[in-house]
A protein has these predicted regions:
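Conserved catalytic cysteine-centered active-site region
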Residues: 75-102, 107, 112-117
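Acidic, glycine-rich active-site loops and adjacent beta-strand->loop/helix elements
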Residues: 9, 22-29, 62-67, 88-91, ...
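Beta-strand segments within the central parallel beta-sheet cores of soluble alpha/beta enzyme folds
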Residues: 15-26, 54-63, 82-88, 117-124
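Short glycine/threonine-rich loop-to-helix capping motif typified by GTGT followed
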Residues: 31-38, 63-81, 95-99, 131-138
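Channel- or pocket-lining gating/hinge segments that regulate access to a cavity or pore
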Residues: 1-18
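Active-site pocket-shaping loop/turn-to-helix segments
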Residues: 1, 22-48, 92-102, 106, ...
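Conserved beta-strand-centric core segments of catalytic alpha/beta enzyme folds
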Residues: 1-3, 100-139
């Protein structure tokens, strides 16, 4: 599960935040080549934040087909040892309406396990659109 609230509300409830949202981006491609959406979404969020692909410690790239991740990696140059390290949607499933939550939980758990700082989640959302989110693990 993912629980989202302000830092103020977390303090009020005596809860310790595990991560914060660093940035969001949305991008689209020609619907005919819709499986390429994560590529411009990733480029857009990195440009927006000033981070480089090498600044990201863990990637969760949702895929319905293996070619999505391979095309994404070829274009971004991401280190594949940091991509879907616990298995992607092909191995673990692609839950309808819950992919984002699954990816976010996996991403944060892996950042905590490895001591990483930044995690990037990127996924297609249909019709050529894709979204990207960078989270920052808090100590």
């Amino acid at each position: 599960a993912v629980l989202i609230m302000s830092a103020e509300k977390a303090a009020e409830l005596g809860m310790k935040p595990r991560a914060k949202f660093h940035s969001f981006a949305l991008a689209g491609t020609d619907p005919v080549t819709m499986l390429k959406g994560p590529i411009p979404a990733t480029k857009k969020i990195l440009e927006k934040t000033g981070l480089s692909i090498d600044d990201i410690d863990v990637f969760e790239v949702n895929e319905a087909f293996a070619s999505v991740v391979l095309a994404w990696q070829k274009e971004t140059g991401a280190d594949m040892s940091k991509v879907n390290v616990n298995g992607g949607a092909i191995a673990l499933g692609h839950p309808l309406g819950a992919s984002g939550t699954k990816l976010m939980a996996t991403l944060l758990n892996e950042l905590e396990r490895t001591g990483g700082k930044y995690g990037l989640q990127v996924m297609c959302e249909g019709g050529g659109m894709a979204n990207a989110t960078i989270i920052e693990r808090l100590d």
